[in-house]
Amino acid sequence: MKIALGIEYNGQNYYGWQRQEKVRSVQEELEKALSHIANEKIDIFCAGRTDSGVSGTGQVVHFETNAIRPEKAWAFGTNAHLPDDIAVAWAKQVDDEFHARFSATARRYRYILYCNKLRSAILAGGITHCHLDLDAEKMHQAGQCLLGEQDFSSFRAAQCQSHTPWRNVHHLNVSRIGKYIIVDIQANAFVHHMVRNIVGSLIEVGAGNQPIEWMQWLLEQKNRQLAAPTAKPDGLYLVDVIYPQKFDIPKRPIGPLFLEDGLLNRPLK
């Protein structure tokens, strides 16, 4: 049988999602817990491999198993064997044709900036602190040139293994809640560090160091060295993965935490 799971995790204590030798990964911890419940070795496939320090509230995985368990056992039982910073949010038996990665039509990320002169100890690791009072409206306007199917070479990490820099951005919204600025971006897929590289350059616009038109210019140059430094992994969350309705994948409120859609100033598409 094939099982899909919704996964939430705090990435601060992990060297990314993907299993690696001699370092902790989210994938390894989840596979160990699932293997305990299934009484057999479990290999999982995820919708999106997040980097070291990046968190997820809407990750989706699937695995195949010979074990027959009720859905609640895959959720509650697995959670009992996971560390506190990883949790199963839902479990569902899916059709054989479902694949967590290849069946997905889009991924959605949110990047959280905390704009305050002094940093916060409580929020450390969950947000990126910015001592400047950024202009969220200018950041939003600057980001609109990135919509649609385009070449994102200027926002692509040098070590990116993708065969093409072309991606299709469905929406990019920048909103403010008090001292928090939320960059919300959805695309069919992302090149390596794409969200963090975009946010790094949007910060330059929000700080007044570059004009709104700078983002369009960067996009046209297709040169990563001309864009701003990569934003930190702190504050980046994989919040949703979109699938065709036929798979009936469960949906949860878009996070993280208090940042549900209804609380944002700008309606999200």
Curated annotation (Swiss-Prot):
EC number, as in UniProt: 5.4.99.12
Alphabetical UniProt keywords: Isomerase, tRNA processing
Record's catalysed reaction(s): uridine(38/39/40) in tRNA = pseudouridine(38/39/40) in tRNA
Gene Ontology biological process: tRNA pseudouridine synthesis
Catalytic-site annotation from UniProt: D51
GO MF terms held by the record: RNA binding; tRNA pseudouridine(38-40) synthase activity
Annotated residues for binding of substrate: Y109
Broadest EC class assigned to this enzyme: isomerase
Pfam family name, one: PseudoU_synth_1
Stated family: Belongs to the tRNA pseudouridine synthase TruA family.
Primary role: Formation of pseudouridine at positions 38, 39 and 40 in the anticodon stem and loop of transfer RNAs.
Assembly behavior: Homodimer.
The protein, known as: tRNA pseudouridine synthase A
Organism annotation: Haemophilus influenzae (strain PittGG)
